[in-house]
Amino acid sequence: MSKMMHDQHSASVPASRDRRNFLIAGAGLALAASTLGSSGAVMANPAGQDTSNAPSDAVPVQKETLTTRKLGSLEVSSMGLGCLPMVGYYGGGPRDRKAMVSLIRAAFEQGITFFDTAEVYGPHLSEEFVGEALAPVRDRVVIATKFGFGVEEGKPTSLNSRPDHIRRAVEGSLKRLKTDHIDLLYQHRPDPNVPIEDVAETVKALIQEGKVKHWGLSEASARTIRRAHAVLPVTAVQSEYAMWWREPETRIFPTLEELGIGFVPYCPTARSFLAGAVNPSQRFDSTDRRHNLPRFQPDALAKNMVLLEFAQSWARRKNTTPVQFALAWVMAQRPWIVPIPGTTQYPHLVENSGAPQVRLTDSELREIDAALAKIPLQGGRADPFTESQFDKN
C-alpha cells in the first residue's frame, strides 16, 4: 500500500466514526423518550453503558413501526435483531442481563418484531435474555432459535442433529424462551452424519405437536435446501451476507426465489467493519471472534479499508451513515431478505432501525454493483475450522 493510500485510510476512518457518533447522538436526543419503558424505567443507556435499574417485568410499548416482509408465509418486521453479541461474542464477556433485557425491549419499541437467538449462544444465555425480555409481548413477536450443536459443561461441542438431540434442544429452548412454541426453528449447521430428510421429519413432528411453527436452515447448500424442502417446506435460510460476502447470490438466491423461501443474512454490516468501528491498525483481543478471522488480520484489514471508504462515500451521498447504507443495500437486493444486525448498545440499535428508510434506486444499485465488482477483498470470511462446518455440497 502506498503512503498516500495509507494516509487516506487513516484519515477516513475517524471521520466516519465522528459522523456516525454525531448522527447517533442526534437520534438519541430526538428519541430520548423511547428509552423509557411504560413504567418510566430506563430501557438502555444512550451512552452505551450497561444499566441494571430496569425492572424485568416492565412491559414495553411499541412506539415506532417498521414495514414488514415475508419469509415464506411468515410475516416479520423488515429488520430483525441478532442477539449473539449480547453474550460477548466480540469480546468483553456476557453483558449485564438487565441491560440486555432492556435493550431487547427497546428494539420492540423501535418496531422490531423479529428476534434471532440460538441454544449455543452463551450457551443458553442469549435465549434467556430473549425469553425474559419478550415474555410480556410474546404474542406480538416472532422468535427464531437454532439447534445443531452439542453442549457439554457449558460449552458447545460438535455438530449434532440426531433426532433425539433435536428434541432435547427444543425442550430446553422452550423453557429458556418462556414460551410454548418456537416461531422459527433453524438447523444451525447441516450435520454430515445425519441425513437432512431425518432432520426435516423430526421438525415436522415437532410442528404437528405445536412446539414449532416454521423451520429453516443456516449455511446450507442449494442441494440441501432442496432436499429439506421436499420433506417439509422451508420458511427461511440464514447465511452470512454483506457487501464483502456475496456468495449466496450465485446458487442460494435462485433456489430460494424458485421455492418461495426467505433469506435472513447475519453479519450484514461485515461484523461492524462497514459501521466504521474498525481501524486499519486495530488488533483484536483473543475473546473477540474477529481475532482469528482472515479478513480482520492486519494486512488484509488495511487493504480492505477501500470498501469502508466506498460505503462512507455513499453514506455522504445519501445523507445517512455507512452502517445504514450497508443495511439498506442488503435489503434492496430482494424483497424477501430480512437482515438481523446485532448490537449491545442503544444508539446503534436506533441507527440500525433507521436503515429501512434509506432508499436506493435501481440505477444507484447498478452503480454500486459495478463499483463493488472492482474492489478486491483480502482474506476469507472464516477460520478453517468454522469453514469446515459450512455445507458446500
Task: Give the location of each predicted region.
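N-terminal secretory signal peptides
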Residues: 1-17
